[in-house]
């Protein structure tokens, strides 16, 4: 009885992992397709750059030291700009 239960749970775990890996590969392949528009990525880049610059300028006008705003998603704030890490 125990062996059957362990076998069923193992098969279920393998199936879940396989499905997750397959979905991830499919998502990556869609991103890697040639000719896919990057306009959305460019818009995000511009937005992060703008947010970082504006945040730093506002702090400078308030006579405070410019504390760099943390950028999200693999970006960091440097020279009043968000740059990819």
Swiss-Prot record:
UniProt-recorded Gene Ontology molecular function terms: toxin activity
This protein's name: U4-theraphotoxin-Hhn1a
Protein role: Neurotoxin active on both insects and mammals.
Tissue specificity as recorded in UniProt: Expressed by the venom gland.
Record-linked InterPro entries: Hwtx-2-like
Coiled coil start-end: none
Residues making up the propeptide: 23-48
Signal sequence, start to end: 1-22
Secreted in keyword set: yes
UniProt organism field: Cyriopagopus hainanus
Pfam families reported in the protein's UniProt record: Toxin_20 (PF08089)
Localization: Secreted
Keyword line: Disulfide bond, Neurotoxin, Postsynaptic neurotoxin, Secreted, Signal, Toxin
């Amino acid at each position: 009885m125990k062996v059957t239960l362990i076998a069923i749970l193992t098969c279920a775990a393998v199936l879940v992992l396989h499905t997750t890996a397959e979905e991830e590969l499919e998502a990556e392949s869609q991103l890697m397709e040639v000719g896919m528009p990057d306009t959305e990525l460019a818009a995000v880049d511009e937005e992060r750059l703008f947010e970082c610059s504006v945040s730093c300028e506002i702090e400078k006008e308030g006579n405070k030291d410019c504390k760099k705003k943390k950028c999200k998603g693999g970006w960091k704030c440097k020279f009043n700009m968000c740059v990819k890490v």
